[in-house]
Amino acid sequence: MHIVTNYHLKPLSPHIRHTAFVRKLLFFLVNICVFCNLSAQTLPLSGTILDEKEECIPGVYLIAVNPKTSEVLATTTSSTDGKYVLPTIPLPFILNATHIGYTSLNIPINNKTDMETARILRMQVAIEQLQEVVVTAEPPHIEREIGKFIIRNIAASPFATGSNTYNFLRFMPMIDIKSEGGISILGKNDANIHINGRSVGDNQMAEQMLKGIPANEIARIEIIPVTGSTRSAENRNGIINVVLKKKPDEGLRVFATIEDRQGYYNSPSGIVFMNYAGKRVDLTAGITTSYNQLRQKSNHSYNYLQTGLSTQSDFRERTRTLNAGGYINLNYNISDHHKLGAQISMGGLDYRKNSSSTSTYGRINSDIVDSIYTADVITKSPAPNLTWGANLNYVFKTDNEGSRLNIDLDLKNNSNKRNINNTYRKDYLASSVITDDFSQRPTVGTIVYGGRAEYEHCFNSDNTLQVGLSGYRGTVDNDFFYGLRSGDDYVSDAGRTNRFIYKDYNLAGYINYQRVWSETLETEIGVRAEKYHAKGSQKTTSETVNRNEFDIFPTLSILYMPSDDHELSLDFTSSIMRPYYGQLNPFITYTSPSTYIQNNPNLKSSKGYELMFSYTLFDDYMLTVDYLYDKDLWTDFVLPIADMTRTYTDNYGNGHALDISLFISQSLFKNYWNFSVEAAFGYVSTRGAVSNRKNRLQ
């Protein structure tokens, strides 16, 4: 239907025009007032929830209810730092806050003043008047969330009393604290250690920081054994993230720890950890230093009955390392929607090692010595090796549903220098001759820089989409000096001195979607694409190494909780293990007069596919089964070549690894005794061939 309306206009008198103008002005002012009133009546509400000790309370459930119709207008949950955000809803409404163990709050929000008051909510522990009061603290249990394991309420654990975070991790399932240093998950290599979601430098510094943080200062510990598409595909060792408690406006807290390990030598260490919480500024920082000394001694005797010859081998070694480092992590809350962060970390290492090996040759049951060969190796850092890194990050909360944009810029720099002086001497009859005297001086400089941008969109509390891009570029300059003794100095051997420069870049994009289908089922699916390019230049021989790789890495996580007593999860991920520059340098490196290392510029990257199943029963029993399939594995092969021994790296085949862990935690005799035990089983099988030689290892 098409309707046409015709208007016939006539000139207006001045009085009528004046009256019309006044009406329009009044109409305009009324609209402005109504608009301002509606704007004031629909402001979003955000704030922080604290307990009686001014500590943040995570997991508080908040509901906004219409007081007239009892209609639920909006719901949300407080985050790990106690913050909550409600979307824009009309006034008035009743704000209800509930949490197990706390008295519920019902706050009427009628105007802007009420909204300002609700920006800080304080909840009190629920108290009942009983004839007899028995206070018990429920010990922490492992909780399963999509893609990770979480333990909260650390302070209630008997293992946390008087302990630091490093020692508390010894009682965590799936985690192994190695005696020689390092923390691993399910028998893998050392996991990446994060504090408050970020790296604090290398793992050695992170471990020292954990020794300085009291366990009761932890809000939660996250164990991520299988990383998803949002993480680098080269990270196959998992992540351990320690999240500290946040207490707004608490000011500065300082923790200091001194430790001493007594062996043949003394090995002291010290850690100072600082945490500052203000209205807009959060700062964590740490300083650590350690002096480690190690002494090794071994004796071996070999009798060759067929020839009647005998060999006596004596080995002595002393190692001294001085480590010092620190980091500062600063977060500034510009507003409720904008946060700026920065981090700087720095570490230094001074290294000394003296080793001596003596081989005595003679005959069985004879005191007569035919000859003695002695090898003395002195290794030291000519100057402290420095490592430093910087990070600048920005977070923009795009709405009140939890959507956000994260931007990270990173820079890392490392300098590593060693002087290795080797002296080989032969004692025969009455003569002593130095057969070889040479010096090796490897100098390696590394710089890596790049950034990452990620957008996380929350459609609602049950649907989240993550999309991200990252790009990193690195340069490694390996300058290897090999010199022969000439007087009081060493002169370069042109056939054994070399310089290798390796440049690479990695471009990645990923998408990840998480869905909560019901109270019993959650899923997460993602895919990551990486483009890797590298070029190495051997300056001595003019040889080049080129690598171009493009790979797709799918991931999938399923969490099924049929009841409060049963949790089942299945995680699948794919990863890649790329050879580092030292394995690709085509130049031969001589390590002794009779041994050398020949690298392989054609070494293939190894792709892996991992599947992990987990079952938790009654929060006290947890079974974890992890299976890993690796393709194109590589290893070092030691083979005799003429009168020399060659170490050669090559791909040889595929591998299967199975790790099973059963963890049991029980409180006995009314929580007077706490029983915790973990049993682990590991099986590895590899099969392949190198140079037509079949190899199988189980």
What are these regions (language model features)?
Residues 325-349, 379-538, 561-569, 623-625, ...:
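Face-selective signature of the C-terminal outer-membrane beta-barrel domain
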Residues 166-202:
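Extracytoplasmic beta-strand/coil segments of soluble accessory domains associated
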Residues 50, 63-65, 98-102, 115-158, ...:
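Short, acidic, small-residue-rich periplasmic hinge/interaction motif at the N-terminus
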Residues 171, 198-225:
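Short acidic/polar hinge/loop motifs at secondary-structure boundaries
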Residues 233-240, 248-299, 321-324:
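Outer-membrane beta-barrel translocator/receptor signature
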